């Protein structure tokens, strides 16, 4: 089943390599693109960009790929403020229109 999102775009950031991948039906689609390009799973974090919003309202740090107890992240939301800040910085760099 193909899912079309009209209000947001799914994305994944590699906080070590400083790159992001956007789009796909699932966060795992962008995750696979980065992993296939040499990223390590421990550095990949999922997020959502909300269309029509700006600033902090435009980004959400939630994805099923963020669940990783071995890295002390037990839920879908990125719990580590340092990791969240790195993801935010990358999204701001690559999508400056968001005004992050």
Model-found features: residue ranges?
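Negatively charged, low-complexity tracts enriched in Asp/Glu with abundant Ser/Thr
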Residues: 1-33
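Charge-dense, low-complexity intrinsically disordered segments
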Residues: 2, 6, 74-81
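Generic structural hydrophobic/aromatic packing signal, biased to beta-strands
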Residues: 8, 12-15, 61, 87, ...
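Short, well-structured alpha-helical interface segments that form or flank functional binding sites
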Residues: 10, 42, 82
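Amphipathic, interaction-prone secondary-structure segments
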Residues: 25-56
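Intrinsically disordered, low-complexity regulatory segments enriched in Ser/Thr/Pro
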Residues: 51, 55-78
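Well-ordered alpha/beta subsegment
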Residues: 76-100
């Amino acid at each position: 089943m193909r899912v079309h999102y009209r209000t947001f775009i799914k994305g994944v950031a590699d906080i070590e390599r400083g790159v992001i991948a956007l789009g796909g039906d699932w966060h795992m689609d962008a995750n696979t693109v980065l992993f296939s390009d040499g990223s390590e799973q421990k550095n990949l974090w999922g997020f959502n960009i909300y269309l029509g919003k700006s600033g902090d309202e435009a980004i959400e740090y939630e994805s099923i790929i963020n669940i990783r107890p071995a890295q002390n992240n037990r839920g879908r939301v990125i719990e580590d403020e340092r990791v969240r800040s790195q993801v935010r910085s990358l999204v701001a760099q690559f999508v400056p229109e968001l005004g992050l």
